[in-house]
């Protein structure tokens, strides 16, 4: 977002490095993750657009929607230009798309908050596996930290092969491919 907004260029496609297949016809630009720039973007969105835009962007990013990064990028860059009214500009396709991606992610997360069941796999240690359409493991995990603050637990997203692990003090989201998890 930072580089795109500063350089006034919007890419046609955004790839995660591990998913990119080199194509000689494309003009590519590799952008390394820069936590200082991302911090500035987060603060800038909240200050210059509104908290709702940050919330919408985060929850839309959890979506499994194809090309979500481009929609979110356009939404944020335009938001920096027009401010909080970006959220009411639903006739613009990428704004509409971001709002709908957010709604789908939040809806699925809400549904799983009620449906998820843990099983005790060791004393004071619970496990649950999920197969969500969207990457909602972090907000779902935070919900259960608030509900079960004294319980150690793992929520295993079997689709993405990641786990939300909470030990009553802190949480981590880790790759589940290399750890022994019950079937």
Residue ranges and their predicted role:
Residues 1-36:
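N-terminal ordered "arm"
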Residues 15-18, 31-183:
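Extended, charged helical/alpha-beta scaffold domains that provide interaction surfaces
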